[in-house]
């Protein structure tokens, strides 16, 4: 009896993590849309700006210069990623918490960016990290979630 409760509570931890990241991602993007005009910048710290930009492509604006087909392609890739990662999680042993966490983070990020593509036709990016005049690619919380999930998976795969 106790083991079933433990297994269910662990599932809820991962589901709650996904929901929390989605709420954080969607809320932050809505605030950016509401308070910062497109292509405007708000300085937060010396190395951090909020720069409101619309990304019609993938990471690093890959495919953003295409004529619209990329929205459907990237949405399909996101849906397949979410489905595959969910299937992988259901096949993992409950003791593989690091892998489940990593896949949950990737699912949350892919879902956040998919929601943007469906509702806006693009992904809202706003986190601008820079040193003087050098700026890293602008990103969002969903991108951070995907990145952290990938880093966790890489550490798991390369530490054994």
Curated annotation (Swiss-Prot):
What reactions does this protein catalyze?
A: Release of signal peptides from bacterial membrane prolipoproteins. Hydrolyzes -Xaa-Yaa-Zaa-|-(S,diacylglyceryl)Cys-, in which Xaa is hydrophobic (preferably Leu), and Yaa (Ala or Ser) and Zaa (Gly or Ala) have small, neutral side chains
* Positions in coiled-coil regions: none
Instruction: Name the family.
Output: Belongs to the peptidase A8 family.
- Write down what this protein is called: Lipoprotein signal peptidase
Protein's membrane topology: Multi-pass membrane protein
- Catalytic residues, per the record, are 125, 143
Please name the top-level EC class of this enzyme: hydrolase
Task: Cite the annotated pathway.
Answer: Protein modification; lipoprotein biosynthesis (signal peptide cleavage)
Q: Tell me which Gene Ontology terms the entry assigns under biological process.
A: proteolysis
Could you confirm whether the keyword Cell inner membrane appears in this record? yes
Chief subcellular location:
membrane
Q: Which GO terms describe its molecular function?
A: aspartic-type endopeptidase activity
Which subcellular locations apply to this protein? Cell inner membrane
Q: What is its EC number?
A: 3.4.23.36
- PROSITE patterns linked: SPASE_II (PS00855)
Function text: This protein specifically catalyzes the removal of signal peptides from prolipoproteins.
Q: Which residues cross the membrane?
A: 13-33, 72-92, 104-124, 134-154
Q: Which UniProt keywords apply?
A: Aspartyl protease, Cell inner membrane, Cell membrane, Hydrolase, Membrane, Protease, Transmembrane, Transmembrane helix
**What cellular-component terms does GO give this entry?**
plasma membrane
